[in-house]
Swiss-Prot record:
The lineage of its organism: Bacteria, Bacillati, Bacillota, Bacilli, Bacillales. The gene is ydbA. Pfam families: EcsC. InterPro entries: EcsC. It comes from Bacillus subtilis (strain 168). This is Uncharacterized protein YdbA.
Length: 272
């Protein structure tokens, strides 16, 4: 399979590093969206609070075993085979050798499919206002975890490994973190494929609570509008689409960065 030139890999790495710097800026919408969370806690009925408690357990279960959220690796392998019929794709090992533009295209396509599903979910649950909001948050969390796993596979990483599931949860955290949190997470993930770094990150994800509450907070401002029955349909669809778009972008950038760094290492080894 044709591989990228070293210069091209460095150029793409620069673009990802620029994106990482942009993540560490405070945008107006982020300032605005973090205002009403104390208010949201007061407005959130007890049955939704219990639902959030259940989500904490589910995220913990996902990291330990993959739980109900594991994705279909075979389906993604078939996509690569269709894109590159002259090559043979039977496993993740084969995907790892695929050209980066093909990885990008498949990862983006998987993200769009999940985003469309989340948009429909948001519109449907928005009709009933606060009572169906309880069903929406876990559904979108599930779609987010599946999206990140699809992207992991598209770049040749195996979400059946605990190391990758920890990375996926960190991607989820990055999407919903404030600017200080984003800076900290990006620093943690800088050399993720070194064993010591992975173990440090794994030990830091002790409080699943911060993951899910951060995720809930991202929904906060957007979802306040969804509490109004019927009108919430429009806001629910828009909020879910925005969330899954962010998840897809984050997953693609961080997984692509790892794949580029791996390829640069391989290039250096070949030159020795």
């Amino acid at each position: 399979m044709p591989t990228e030139r070293k210069e091209d890999l460095h150029q793409q790495l620069k673009e990802i590093e620029k994106w990482e710097k942009d993540q560490q800026k405070v945008w107006f919408w982020e300032k605005l969206s973090r205002l009403p969370f104390q208010l949201l806690d007061k407005l959130t009925p007890e049955f939704i609070q219990k639902k959030i408690g259940k989500l904490l357990d589910e995220v913990g279960s996902f990291v330990q075993t993959g739980g109900q959220y594991l994705t279909s690796e075979k389906q993604i392998i078939r996509m690569f085979q269709k894109k590159l019929p002259e090559e043979i794709f039977e496993s993740l090992e084969d995907i790892r050798k695929a050209p980066l533009p093909v990885m990008d295209e498949i990862a983006e396509g998987m993200g769009k499919n999940r985003t469309n599903a989340a948009t429909v979910q948001g519109a449907t649950t928005g009709v009933g206002g606060v009572f169906t909001l309880a069903a929406d948050i876990p559904a979108v969390l599930g779609l987010s975890l599946k999206t990140l796993q699809d992207i992991a596979v598209a770049y040749g990483y195996d979400p059946k490994e605990k190391k990758e599931r920890v990375f996926i949860v960190k991607c989820l955290q990055l999407t919903s973190a404030d600017v200080v949190g984003k800076r900290s997470i990006l620093q943690e993930l800088k050399h993720y494929d070194q064993d010591r770094t992975y173990k440090n990150v794994a030990s830091q994800i002790q409080g699943w609570r911060e993951v899910v509450l951060g995720y809930r907070d991202t929904f906060g401002w957007k979802k306040l509008f969804q509490i109004v029955p019927v009108a919430g349909m429009v806001f629910g669809a828009a909020a879910n689409r925005s969330t899954l778009n962010d998840i897809t972008e984050t997953g693609m950038m961080l997984y692509k960065k790892r794949r580029i760094l791996e390829r640069l290492k391989e290039t250096e080894r070949e030159m020795e």
